[in-house]
Amino acid sequence: MMRLIKNNTFGFTLIEVLIAIFLFAIVMTTIFGAYVQIFFTVQTTENDALTYEMGKNAMDRMLMDLNSIVITKPPIFKKPDTRPEDDELDPYRFEGESDGEFATLRFVSHAHIVIDGFSPKGGGVAQIKYYVTEDEQNEEIMVLRRCDDIDLDEGCDRLDDPILCENVVGFNLSFVYYEKEENIESFTEWNSDDKDMKFATPRAIEITLKLSDPDKPTEHPLVFQTGVTFPLYRLKDKKVM
């Protein structure tokens, strides 16, 4: 007699296969999305860290220069009408302008960076200038440059000066003057060689530097702020009218 053997082994149905593929796709999409999120988070953190380090180094350099500022007083300082004809500008003048997005600042400091073969032995004083220009490689990027020149009479914006930081979206200065602390005034520009300023220098300066993330230039920039009270200063000449 023949026996009928029942086969209880079943294969997957098409519906089950499709459901499995669908669930697998969901899992892989979730994993990939998490990976991409982690990758961009790490990359953003690294960019922020680099931007912060760059801005901090620039501010530290400015503080060092300004804390070593050279300010002359009479009789070394002479008003324009008492100077030789070939010496129209005071080589130790303090000049700054901050009426737009990007300020300029020029002064003389003991914080000269000595370079062998180009600097006098033992260092010396140099004119320091901070200014913002377009990057030579990318005109959409603004960079903060620092000029350091022992020739106090030569112009100091040759556009080949070292770059302190990139992706600058703001560089602003506020010049603070007072003779009594209850009469503090702030200015957006200053020229210690100007009769209107009565040949004085500021007592302090406030600095704001804004740097953007190169990948997100339109978002909120990283803002650095500090201030310096000058160890030396020249008060307004009361005799100047």
Region locations from a protein language model:
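Short, mixed charged/polar active-site loops
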Residues: 121-127, 156-162, 219-225
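Residue-level detector of short, conserved catalytic/binding motifs and their immediate flanks
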Residues: 12, 128, 205
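Short linear sequence signals and composition-biased patches located at protein termini or domain-edge surfaces
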Residues: 162-165, 169-241
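Alpha-helical hydrophobic helix detector
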Residues: 17-33
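Extracytoplasmic beta-strand-rich oligomerization domains located immediately C-terminal to a leader/signal peptide
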Residues: 34-156
